[in-house]
Amino acid sequence: MKIAVDVMGTDYGPKELVLGAVNAVKEYGCETVLVGDEKIIRELLVKYGADKNPKITIHHASEVIAMDEHPAIAVKSKKDASIVVAAGLLRNNECDALVSSGSTGAAVASALFCVGRIRGVERPAIATPIPSLKGTTVVLDSGAKVDAKPEHMVQSAIMGTVYAEKILKISQPKVGLLNIGEEETKGNEQALATYPLLKDTRTINFIGNVEGRDINKGMVDVVVCDGFVGNVVLKFGEGLAKAIMTLIKEAIMNGGILAKLGGLLIKPALKGLKKRLDPAEYGGALLLGIRAPFIICHGSSKAKAITNAIHVAMDFAEQDVVSIIKDKIAESKEMRN
């Protein structure tokens, strides 16, 4: 199993991605090809004592797509950008999966232009796992495309169901449409048009509308929405989790001696809670609907997140999620005809 890692264009630079890849090779026994500035990568491999590891190779790329560049234009003009080169390796079957934590827009554009969509898939979707009271809930789309037609939402539900079954190991995952109320008559034009289509899709277990407050309750396993709403939900959740942990810490530190003693007693529990809420524990988000396994990580990902993302990428490839999605999309289309 060989995983390509685009090590350029992130908040912390290549060091965290290279370290994460090195740790993944040690922990999971996979091969990795590190794509980016060869000189920088080689220096980091020497630093981490991995320059002689035969399972780690380097593929030089001289350009980087910055976060503020227009994704489609940059992907077309910067042929030697690390994400474009890495996507080319994926397209040519020189690796089994790709992990990137650079520009999300550039990653999606590279996936579309260089790798291509699964036959029958109209729009890819980013599937992001988030913690819930009952385990993990996947939200999609969380940013691949800000606008979505009802048919795109249906395909997201189908792909999200496959993700929940194969990656999260959930039997008959429940699917919910994110809305402002549970009633079938609630919502904007998009929601009202999407609801009956989901209801009639026999390849998913659709239970109806869910509200924002229901996501973390674990009422459903798959939450379907457009990329604009999904991205807002995701980032709000990340910010809220950090705020809650900060408020707890401040309450303990400012609450006097009893609060501090109580804090010591619950410290192990708080560490467990922090770990469960940490996005790094989930690795990255899956870009579903592309013809090969493609993982998108947070721009601020550190080594731990990259190591976990590589593990997810391996699982994605081993479970042959791409082929299953292709079959499910085709099956759904046949049922409607």
Q: Which residues does each predicted region cover?
A:
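Glycine-rich phosphate/diphosphate-binding loop of Rossmann-like nucleotide-binding domains
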Residues: 15-16, 31-33, 39, 146-212, ...
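Short, glycine-rich nucleotide/cofactor-binding loops
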Residues: 5-15, 144-154, 296-301
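Short glycine/serine/threonine-rich phosphate/pyrophosphate-binding segments
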Residues: 13-17, 80-93, 97-111, 122-127, ...
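N-terminal phosphate-binding or glycine-rich loops at protein starts, especially the Walker A/P-loop
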Residues: 1-42
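Short helix-capping segments at alpha-helix termini
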Residues: 25-28, 46-55, 168, 198-204
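Glycine-rich phosphate/nucleotide-binding loop
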Residues: 112-125, 131-139, 219-223, 227-336
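Phosphate/nucleotide-donor binding subsite
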Residues: 50-95
